[in-house]
């Protein structure tokens, strides 16, 4: 039996130590911003920050959910910071980002789930960096009427919402969420604004069956999702869900091949794939694939 306490060689990454990494870290700290890179203990932080790529996390650093896979703090959330959109826009400008990814904690305590704050962040970025494309990775806005309309009206270039895992694992892994609500949100954004690219991601290695993963692919295509990401689940602490399996690179290649047959414009599947990993390069590929789909 494999020792799941020891990560296989294909998971290991170099410790961050570049000058650019520390410059990015200092800028984020000085502007009092949060990043999911730090809060979720992302394994790709060294590579991304060395390239001045960081996924900004808005709406505070405390989540109202307690998902079993996530390392973000849970509890009573922070007060909404009305100046955060301006500081975020300043960071985007100083980092000279061509493509920015904005995510957030869940804010079940807010009437709109934080949708208007997302819109304000997008608007501020577009004021100061009009050529920067904007990708948002949102919570599910469960029971937040009108949230999808607010988001669609703000016109992000990419709308991302992760289904995270297969529906049979929701009760244990993502207990505060509803699988079909996530699908509905993704479909709603596409129906409200067809020019917005939609994206969703999931983790494997939590005990799911391959047949279940393939069913999720079908469900996402039914919801008109354009871009699918699949990555290895890594246990953040001993208090989180345990890794059931380390999926091999060959198995990821198989999942990617299957996903491509389903009609996604883009698929990224590998052990270290994360929602915003290489997001800037992938956005360019996404646009190119879309243009090719129009003439094929």
Swiss-Prot record:
Q: Which SMART domains match?
A: Elp3
- Annotated [4Fe-4S] cluster 2 binding lies at 63, 67, 70
Superkingdom of origin: Bacteria
Cofactor note (record): Binds 2 [4Fe-4S] clusters per subunit. One cluster is coordinated with 3 cysteines and an exchangeable S-adenosyl-L-methionine.
> Which cofactor(s) are needed, names only?
[4Fe-4S] cluster
Protein family (similarity comment): Belongs to the radical SAM superfamily. Lipoyl synthase family.
Q: What is this protein called?
A: Lipoyl synthase
Q: Which organism is it from?
A: Rickettsia canadensis (strain McKiel)
């Amino acid at each position: 039996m494999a020792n799941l306490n020891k990560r296989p060689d294909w998971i290991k990454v170099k410790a961050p130590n570049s000058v650019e990494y520390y410059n990015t870290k200092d800028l984020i700290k000085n502007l009092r911003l949060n990043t999911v890179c730090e809060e979720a203990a992302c394994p790709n932080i060294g590579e991304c920050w060395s390239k001045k790529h960081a996924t900004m996390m808005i709406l505070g650093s405390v989540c109202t959910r307690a998902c079993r896979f996530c390392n973000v703090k849970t509890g009573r959330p922070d007060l909404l910071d009305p100046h955060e959109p301006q500081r975020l826009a300043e960071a985007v400008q100083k980092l000279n980002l061509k493509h920015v990814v904005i995510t957030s904690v869940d804010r079940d305590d807010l009437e709109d789930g934080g949708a208007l704050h997302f819109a304000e962040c997008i608007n501020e970025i577009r004021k100061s960096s009009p050529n920067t494309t904007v990708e948002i990775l949102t919570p599910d806005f469960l029971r937040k009427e009108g949230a999808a309309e607010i988001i669609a009206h703000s016109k992000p270039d990419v709308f991302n919402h992760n289904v995270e895992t297969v529906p049979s694992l929701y009760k244990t892994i993502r207990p505060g969420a509803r699988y079909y609500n996530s699908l509905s949100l993704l479909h709603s954004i596409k129906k409200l604004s067809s020019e917005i690219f939609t994206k969703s991601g999931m983790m494997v290695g939590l005990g799911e069956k391959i047949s279940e993963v393939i069913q999720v692919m079908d469900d996402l295509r039914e919801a008109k999702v354009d871009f699918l990401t699949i990555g290895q689940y890594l246990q953040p602490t001993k208090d989180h869900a345990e890794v059931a399996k380390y999926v091999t690179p060959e198995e990821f290649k198989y999942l990617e091949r299957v996903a491509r047959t389903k009609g996604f414009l883009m698929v990224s599947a590998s052990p270290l794939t994360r929602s915003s990993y290489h997001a800037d390069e992938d956005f360019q590929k996404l646009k190119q694939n879309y243009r090719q789909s129009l003439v094929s």
